[in-house]
Amino acid sequence: MLLIGVAGTELSAQERDWLQHDAVAGVVLFKRNFASRTQVAELSAAIRAAAPRPVLICVDQEGGRVQRFREGFSALAPLQSFGAQYAQDPEAALAAARAHAQLMASEVRASGVDLSFAPVVDLGRGNRAIGDRAFSDEPQIVATFTRAYVQALHGAGMAATLKHFPGHGTVLEDTHVDHASDPRPLEVLQAEDLVPFVAGIEAGADAVMMAHVVYPQVAPEPAGYSQRWIEQILRGQMGFRGVVFSDDIGMAASFSAGGVAGRVHAHLDAGCDVVLVCHPELVAESLQAVQGRSLNTAALIGLIGRGALGWDGLLAGTDASFTTPLSAHFGTTA
């Protein structure tokens, strides 16, 4: 299955045709797709209307510098701010993180979008792409926040996606623009980077997004192309039964598998359920690549939200999913 990107704030005729394809599981939205709350809700409705089956609509609405929807949405803090607070007041920090998850999920749902790819559970150890997106550099602290965040997302009616497996935080390179390799053995990764993923899986996380990082002492290819990482370790040893997403095949670190078709096939052959094709110019070739493949068309049904909350209900605070008044932690919009 493919999760595709579209070019603008409205669907083109070609994009409507793409959504008819059996291999298209849904759409991932970016800043380029956002103009206002009303517009993104209308775009979400148009995506669903164009597809002959239920589809998944996703976004990266983490907070901080990775927040695609801004005007009319709450200004969400980066996750690192909660880790910093944890040293002074752990209970308050965890409560704030739960409120952050609840608010983010509720606003995203109110826009007709099913899920944000969250939380980031990488360790914050200097990676250029991760930075303040990580809760902490300490595995147990990240694990504690991961449990809380997953539970809060579920309370707000959103599936939780742990990223970027098996851990992106220790390598320096940004895989959007460069190849990355982590030389540590599996035993060290299990004692450090995998700890938050174990916690998230135990908390009931619904999905995992793979990293385009090579761990040569474990497998020779990037993790998203590796049956060893996906089938043997994530599913076999760690017992994960949810959906596995690739990271975007337009990122530089994915190019090791060759052209567009090679990247799509490498992810699916390794055990990814869904391949992210975020750049519209790569969609047609990706669709051609999956012709004739047997695809798990039911894999994403559990990730599709329980229906849009609606902004009126959100602002009135009447939805039953709220367990903490949002005003207790947040009250501003960007």
Swiss-Prot record:
The record marks D174 as: Important for catalytic activity. Its main location: cytoplasm. Gene3D superfamilies: Glycoside hydrolase, family 3, N-terminal domain. GO terms for molecular function: beta-N-acetylhexosaminidase activity. It catalyses: Hydrolysis of terminal non-reducing N-acetyl-D-hexosamine residues in N-acetyl-beta-D-hexosaminides. Pathway: Cell wall biogenesis; peptidoglycan recycling. This is Beta-hexosaminidase. The gene is nagZ.
